[in-house]
């Protein structure tokens, strides 16, 4: 079979053959037209099929791209949230790490509010857990470092200060008359005579004795 060098040469050859066939065989031109029409339909169907295939391929690629972007954004949000959580927990460690300083301040002062702050911080430290293994190690070290540092002495001094505070509050309530105490009248001195009253009675007694002596001498 001969091959044509180009489409134009092929078209020219087909046109020449068609003319010869028209002259030699009547009706051949109609058959050629049908063949051409059929070929055109086949070509159009192929073009449509190719277009549909391209669209489907584009749609699949677009879905893959959207899925990738969604997963990537989700991963970024998780990393950002994890970073914020880590930062927050590190800040919390920094806040709780000053418990030792507060304990020293508490030993040097009798501030009940400071004791309450220390108690809250220790409670928060004891109840703190995390899924981060590195942070968990730091937290455990912080617990041991703070809770095992002269805690017995700290508790003893705190108990002593609590007793002093309770005693001072009790005395204040007695002086106000809010609490009755054996031997005491609310708001007054103990039952009996005060030192001033004793002195006054002694002075009065001395006066009576002197008057009796003067009466005796006058008689």
From Swiss-Prot:
Organism: Komagataella phaffii (strain GS115 / ATCC 20864)
Region feature Disordered, mapped onto this chain: 153-219
Disulfide bond residue pairs: none
Residue ranges, compositional bias (Basic and acidic residues): 153-176
Alphabetized Pfam families for the sequence: RRT14 (PF17075)
Record-stated family: Belongs to the RRT14 family.
Keywords on record: Nucleus, Transcription, Transcription regulation
Compositionally biased tracts (Acidic residues): 194-219
Protein name per UniProt: Regulator of rDNA transcription 14
Gene Ontology CC entries for this record: nucleolus
Record function comment: Involved in ribosome biogenesis, probably through modulation of rDNA transcription.
């Amino acid at each position: 079979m001969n091959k044509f060098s180009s489409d134009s040469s092929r078209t020219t050859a087909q046109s020449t053959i068609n003319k010869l066939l028209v002259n030699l065989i009547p009706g051949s031109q109609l058959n050629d037209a049908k063949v051409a029409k059929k070929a055109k339909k086949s070509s159009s169907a192929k073009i449509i099929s190719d277009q549909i295939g391209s669209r489907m391929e584009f749609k699949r690629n677009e879905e893959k791209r959207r899925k990738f972007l969604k997963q990537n954004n989700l991963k970024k949000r998780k990393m950002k949230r994890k970073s914020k959580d880590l930062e927050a927990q590190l800040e919390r460690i920094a806040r709780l790490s000053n418990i030792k300083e507060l304990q020293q301040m508490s030993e040097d002062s009798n501030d009940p509010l400071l004791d309450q702050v220390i108690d809250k911080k220790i409670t928060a430290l004891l109840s703190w857990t995390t899924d981060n293994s590195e942070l968990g190690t730091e937290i455990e070290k912080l617990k041991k470092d703070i809770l095992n540092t002269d805690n017995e002495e700290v508790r003893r001094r705190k108990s002593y200060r609590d007793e002093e505070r309770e005693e001072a509050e009790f005395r204040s309530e007695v002086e106000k008359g809010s609490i009755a105490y054996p031997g005491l009248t609310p708001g007054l001195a103990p039952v009996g005579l005060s030192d001033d009253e004793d002195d006054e009675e002694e002075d009065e007694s001395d006066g009576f004795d002197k008057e009796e002596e003067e009466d005796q001498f006058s008689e």
